[in-house]
């Protein structure tokens, strides 16, 4: 899908919000490690709604915690209750069923497109869901990515699983075919950054193995709308932090700015 809003002459950016890992239950009162995850999602969506500079939202997966269809409906209801009108693009996380996402996200403001073309940027949503909690970008998905990349545009890739280890337990559920993935990424000099969910925390990382002719590709991870993981615990444990999301601003000259919003 092409967003037709032009860049202004004074290089004003296109800004969007990344949200991730809502981990909803069938019950609107469902708690995930002591946190009301639906209430946290609502806080995030209301914050986004209050920011008129945000032109669209990308949800990078793990909508559900209990794998019920009602949890998907609760997400949709929350979006409508918060009066979100900007397009919402989406990816499946390891907890999600892609067919259920498509079923419940079939009407506006949800958009099923996995590619957003701007005047000077291309944002691609990369499927990393596998049959296990870990991620895998299959050969077909890698070929699709290569075929879609427009060499005259700056590239930002969005995915659920992290392609760089973060140093705590979630790494055993990270991207399993990192080498094949990075072999593709490092063959392009216009991929500026990758953004992911899954790790329940915000970090800025670079791949240790990069092409000698290219600048290192930056990985931005996103805080969850549900809970933030405690990286000192070998397993799921929640920090005493609220929900969060990440903002990206894409400029016509190729500059990318990002900031994390915690609530």
Curated annotation (Swiss-Prot):
Keywords: Hydrolase, Iron, Metal-binding, Nucleotide-binding. GO terms for molecular function: 3',5'-cyclic-AMP phosphodiesterase activity; metal ion binding; nucleotide binding. This is Probable cyclic nucleotide phosphodiesterase CPS_4178. Its EC number is 3.1.4.-. SUPFAM superfamilies: Metallo-dependent phosphatases. It comes from the Bacteria. Fe cation 1 binds at residues 21, 23, 62, 200. AMP binds at residues 23, 62, 94-95, 200. Fe cation 2 binds at residues 62, 94, 160, 198. Coiled coil: none annotated. Belongs to the cyclic nucleotide phosphodiesterase class-III family. Signal peptide: none annotated. It holds the Pfam family Metallophos. The gene is icc. Gene3D superfamilies: 3.60.21.10. Binds 2 Fe(2+) ions per subunit. Its cofactor is Fe(2+).
């Amino acid at each position: 899908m092409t967003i037709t809003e032009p860049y202004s002459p004074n290089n004003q950016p296109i800004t969007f919000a990344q949200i991730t890992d809502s981990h909803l239950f069938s019950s609107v009162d469902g708690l995930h490690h002591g946190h009301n995850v639906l209430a946290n999602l609502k806080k995030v969506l209301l914050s986004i709604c209050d920011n008129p500079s945000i032109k669209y939202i990308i949800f990078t997966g793990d909508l559900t915690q209990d794998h019920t269809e009602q949890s998907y409906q609760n997400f949709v209801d929350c979006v409508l209750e918060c009066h979100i009108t900007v397009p919402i693009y989406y990816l499946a996380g390891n907890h999600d069923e892609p067919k259920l996402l498509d079923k419940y996200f079939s009407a506006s403001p949800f958009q099923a497109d996995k590619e957003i073309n701007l005047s000077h940027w291309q944002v691609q949503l990369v499927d990393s869901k596998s049959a296990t909690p870990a991620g895998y970008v299959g050969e077909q998905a890698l070929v699709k990515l290569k075929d879609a990349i427009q060499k005259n545009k700056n590239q930002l890739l969005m995915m659920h699983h992290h392609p760089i280890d973060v140093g705590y337990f979630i790494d055993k559920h990270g991207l399993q075919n990192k080498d094949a993935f990075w072999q593709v990424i490092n063959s392009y000099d216009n991929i500026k950054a990758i953004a992911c969910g899954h790790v329940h925390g915000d970090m800025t990382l670079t791949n240790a193995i990069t092409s000698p002719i290219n600048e290192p590709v930056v990985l931005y991870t996103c805080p969850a709308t549900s809970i933030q993981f405690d990286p000192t615990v070998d397993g799921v444990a929640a920090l005493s932090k609220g929900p969060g999301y990440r903002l990206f601003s894409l400029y016509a000259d190729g500059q990318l700015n990002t900031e994390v919003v915690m609530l």
